UniProtKB/Swiss-Prot annotation:
Native source organism of the sequence: Danio rerio (Zebrafish)
Lineage summary: Eukaryota, Metazoa, Chordata, Craniata, Vertebrata
Localisation per UniProt entry: Apical cell membrane; Cytoplasm
Name of protein: N-acyl-aromatic-L-amino acid amidohydrolase (carboxylate-forming) A
Primary location class: membrane
Quaternary structure annotation from Swiss-Prot or TrEMBL: Homotetramer.
Length: 328
């Protein structure tokens, strides 16, 4: 293929997308995940000192769950990051409604009603995990080219920790996380960090990811062409609980030392999963190799989850650039 034909092919492969009106940066969806709480507060301080011009694009900052933040708890009544499905957002509010359901509906109205034309273009929801996951971007669609290109951009720029992409691939109406309210939302999950603690190194990684997201949006809106290519993603398959006593439901084992802190490793049949409190090893019985993540996450004990399992895929994303009058 000649150079001219190759260039023409690449040009034809480009996808033209509308400019992005801005981003909502949300912290404190879980009130004891403090990197996002302090980053949102710092961004609000910068805006107060320097005005909206501190960023090259419109940025909305949101402290998502202020009551939980004040009490440094994950939530008050129920996990708010499970309250953004269409069903929950349309639930009538009564005197007995959980605080987080009320707040989720407030945020839905603040950021644009989920599924409407006026919804926020992008939500970046900030989270910490006690698991050793580095920086993980979590979103709902394997065909959202904007989000995948931002993931790809962060992977090229951030070198201090692994940057991975996790796709949940749920129907958007069933998607229950805050970022699902927007057109191109994702969660930034950074760890390990204990609940109720802020670590400087983890905070810095989160801040760099937010700054780079804003930078990507500004460049995209300004006409930069982002070349396509392959993106390695992990797709959620299922959750695994701890071994339990069948009568009391108490745990009978902990995550095996050979698995602990090895999020996204390749897990094969026969590999150690758990070490029972009586000293026996429980091994993996999966038929195909999978990748565990959120290993021994502190917040998941109440949910009956020791870790999730994912399958690794390679997605090919097209080149993208902003849609203009000439390209429309």
């Amino acid at each position: 293929m000649t150079e001219e034909k190759a260039e023409e092919k690449n040009k034809m492969a480009s996808v033209f997308l509308p400019a992005l009106g801005g981003v909502a940066v949300c912290g404190g969806t879980h009130g004891n995940e403090l990197s996002g709480v302090y980053l949102v507060q710092e961004m609000e301080r910068q805006r107060k000192e320097r005005g909206d011009g501190v960023w090259p694009i419109p940025v909305t900052t949101v402290l998502s769950n202020p009551r939980a933040v004040k009490e440094c708890r994950r939530y008050i009544d129920t996990d708010m990051n499970r309250c953004f499905s269409k069903a929950v957002l349309s639930t009538p509010i009564t005197d007995s409604s959980p605080y987080e359901v009320r707040r989720a509906q407030e945020l839905n109205n603040l950021l644009g009603v989920k599924g409407s034309d006026d919804v926020m273009d992008m939500i970046c929801d900030l989270h910490n995990t006690t698991s050793n996951m580095g920086l993980t971007l979590i979103h709902y669609s394997a065909s959202d080219w904007v989000t995948l290109h931002i993931c790809k951009y962060l992977q090229t720029k951030i070198t201090k920790v692994p940057v991975r992409v996790l796709v949940l691939d749920f129907p958007i109406n069933d998607a229950y996380n805050l970022e699902s309210v927007s057109k191109h939302g994702f969660t930034l999950e950074v760890g390990p960090q204990p609940q109720g603690v802020v670590r400087a190194d983890i905070y810095v990684i989160m801040k760099e990811a937010v700054d780079l997201t804003i930078d990507w949006i500004h460049k995209f809106n300004s006409g930069t062409v982002f070349e396509g290519g392959d993106v390695e993603v992990f797709k959620f398959i299922k959750s695994v609980d701890y071994p339990r006593d069948p009568e009391t439901r108490n745990l009978t084992a902990a995550v095996h030392p050979q698995l602990q802190d090895r999020d996204f490793c390749l897990l094969k049949r026969g590999d150690p999963l758990f070490l029972s409190f009586s000293g026996e090893t429980v091994t993996c019985e999966e038929e195909e190799p999978l990748h565990p993540f959120f290993i021994n996450e502190g917040a998941y004990y109440e949910k009956g989850i020791a870790f999730h399992l994912a399958k690794k895929w390679t997605l090919t994303v097209p080149s993208v650039q902003v849609q203009t009058t000439n390209s429309a």
